[in-house]
């Protein structure tokens, strides 16, 4: 499963280019979308990005709610430590804003995959059936966990050459043993050609070793 976060005005073009490359390989994308990013960008005010998301979702890519205000690196991850009542307020606001824009999803991924116990506890009452964390994929209606560590480029994680090489090796090991591969990249990093190529190369390695592409909707 490949996911992309931080798609907004300045990153939409490189994200679209990366997605076209993967689409040619039959790889769908899970789009991690929040109504706000860094407190400065607002999906409601960006009609072009909304249309981009609508077209991609209609074509088979997935929408995953990525918080209320996805913070830039340096700030604490939004849902990492929230107690249940605060998580409920933020999630309720995020769901309402996204639904007003015509987007709905039963899947939640907190920024940087850091999910507090309080957040996990309130997700079912808000209609979510899946939650994604650093540990894996939480199936909420059965209270089970599909263990699968997320491999991330950017968004608070590494993006250097050695880190990208480490991720490719991890993808290869997981694919060889038939495990679940979760690969994510920030669209901020797709602006950089070398980083985009290395992430695409990691996807190619997984495909060559028999990994079956899917989105989080299909788990």
Predicted regions and their residues:
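A conserved mid-domain beta-alpha-beta active-site/ligand-binding segment of alpha/beta enzyme cores
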Residues: 144-194
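C-terminal domain-boundary segment and adjacent tail
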Residues: 26, 30, 185-219
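Active-site beta->alpha N-cap acidic-glycine motif
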Residues: 1-59, 196
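Alpha-helical scaffolding within the catalytic cores
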Residues: 13-18, 44-56, 133-143, 159-173
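Active-site beta-loop-alpha junctions enriched in small/polar residues
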Residues: 5-7, 34-38, 68-70, 113, ...
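Hydrophobic faces of well-ordered beta-strands that scaffold small-molecule active sites
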Residues: 2-4, 29-31, 63-66, 105-108, ...
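Surface-exposed, active-site-proximal loop segments in enzymatic domains
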Residues: 40, 72-83
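Catalytic domains of cell-wall/extracellular-matrix polysaccharide-remodeling enzymes
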Residues: 81-155, 191-197
């Amino acid at each position: 499963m490949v996911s992309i976060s931080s798609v907004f005005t300045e990153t939409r073009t490189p994200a679209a280019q990366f997605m076209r490359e993967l689409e040619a390989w039959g790889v769908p994308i899970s789009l991690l979308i929040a109504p706000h990013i860094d407190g400065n960008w607002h999906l409601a005010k960006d009609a072009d990005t909304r249309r981009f998301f609508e077209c991609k979702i209609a074509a088979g890519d997935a929408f995953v709610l990525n918080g209320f205000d996805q913070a830039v690196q340096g700030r604490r991850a939004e849902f990492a430590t929230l107690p249940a009542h605060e998580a409920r307020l933020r999630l309720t606001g995020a769901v309402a804003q996204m639904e007003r824009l015509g987007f709905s999803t039963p899947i939640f991924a907190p920024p940087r995959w850091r999910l507090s116990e309080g957040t996990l506890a309130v997700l079912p009452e808000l209609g979510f059936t899946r939650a994604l964390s650093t540990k894996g994929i939480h199936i909420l209606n059965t209270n089970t966990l599909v263990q699968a560590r997320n491999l991330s480029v950017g968004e608070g994680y590494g993006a250097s050459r050695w880190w990208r090489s480490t991720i490719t090796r991890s993808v290869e090991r997981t694919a060889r043993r038939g495990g679940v591969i979760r690969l994510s990249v920030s669209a901020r990093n797709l602006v950089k050609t070398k980083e985009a190529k290395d992430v695409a190369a990691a996807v190619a390695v997984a495909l060559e070793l028999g990994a079956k592409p899917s989105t989080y909707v299909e788990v």
